Structure formats: C-alpha cells, structure tokens
Curated annotation (Swiss-Prot):
<dbReference type="InterPro" id="IPR036227">
    <property type="entry name" value="Ribosomal_uL15/eL18_sf"/>
</dbReference>
<keyword id="KW-0689">Ribosomal protein</keyword>
<comment type="function">
    <text>Binds to the 23S rRNA.</text>
</comment>
<dbReference type="Pfam" id="PF00828">
    <property type="entry name" value="Ribosomal_L27A"/>
</dbReference>
<dbReference type="GO" id="GO:0003735">
    <property type="term" value="F:structural constituent of ribosome"/>
</dbReference>
<dbReference type="InterPro" id="IPR021131">
    <property type="entry name" value="Ribosomal_uL15/eL18"/>
</dbReference>
<dbReference type="GO" id="GO:0019843">
    <property type="term" value="F:rRNA binding"/>
</dbReference>
<comment type="similarity">
    <text>Belongs to the universal ribosomal protein uL15 family.</text>
</comment>
<keyword id="KW-0694">RNA-binding</keyword>
<dbReference type="GO" id="GO:0006412">
    <property type="term" value="P:translation"/>
</dbReference>
<comment type="subunit">
    <text>Part of the 50S ribosomal subunit.</text>
</comment>
<dbReference type="GO" id="GO:0022625">
    <property type="term" value="C:cytosolic large ribosomal subunit"/>
</dbReference>
<dbReference type="InterPro" id="IPR027386">
    <property type="entry name" value="Rbsml_uL15_N"/>
</dbReference>
<dbReference type="InterPro" id="IPR001196">
    <property type="entry name" value="Ribosomal_uL15_CS"/>
</dbReference>
<keyword id="KW-0699">rRNA-binding</keyword>
<dbReference type="InterPro" id="IPR030878">
    <property type="entry name" value="Ribosomal_uL15"/>
</dbReference>
<protein>
    <recommendedName>
        <fullName>Large ribosomal subunit protein uL15</fullName>
    </recommendedName>
</protein>
Amino acid sequence: MIRKSKKITKLRGSRTCGYGAAKKHRGAGHKGGKGLAGVTKHRWIHTVKYMPDHIGKYGFKRHSSLIKELKVINLGQLDEIVSKNKESFEIVDGKIVIDITTLDYEKVLGKGKITCPMIIKAVEFSESAKEKIESAGGEFVEL
C-alpha cells in the first residue's frame, strides 16, 4: 500500500504554507466575502446554476389597508347549524331568520345546499350563495 504524505506536512516550515503572501490567507476578503456576498458579481455560475430564483423581483405585496379578510361560512355548514339548533333561531313567515354576525361570521359562500327557506343577514354574499338562497325560497339581507 502506497503511503502518500499530506501536502500540509510538506509545506510546514515555509511561513505561508502555500497561500502566497501572508495577508492573502486572512479573513473572508480574500475568499470573496462571507455567505451570499457577491452572488451577482463574482459567484455568477453558482448563482445561475443553484439559485436561479435568488435574483430579481417577483409579484407584489398588497397594502394592508386594502386587504379585506372576512370570516366566511358556506351554505352547507350554515344548513347543518340550523338543522341541529332549529329552536334557537327566529321564524318569520315560515322562514328561519339567521344573523351571521351573531355566529362570528361576515360573509356567506355558496358551497353546499340549503334544505329549508331562510332569511340570512350578513355583511357580504357571494353570487352563487345569493342564487342558492333565492332558489330555496329564501332571502338575503346585506348589512
């Protein structure tokens, strides 16, 4: 078996151990910076190959004052709540009256089916929810 001596043992005693001038082996400056410093300057091949999405701007952030985050409930969920607790809701002209805001919701979405006519009061309704409520013989009231 061949035993090859390590390069560093050969270089011991030579003051700079193969790094040229002593100042070239100091700090990160000689290496081109720490971390991701210089990825658009002198580490370009690595950037293009391994981090192609790292450079450039993508999309935008909407201003927080423009974003409306409403708590939503689907018609199917609402129908389940009503069918379990019919006694707790008011009935007017054979229609169950529900105020969504008392249930801590603000918007009604149209997923699911309604089995009985209802008068639903909410801040907002989706178009499909409006159609389904009316087709079931109910009404919607926007607050």
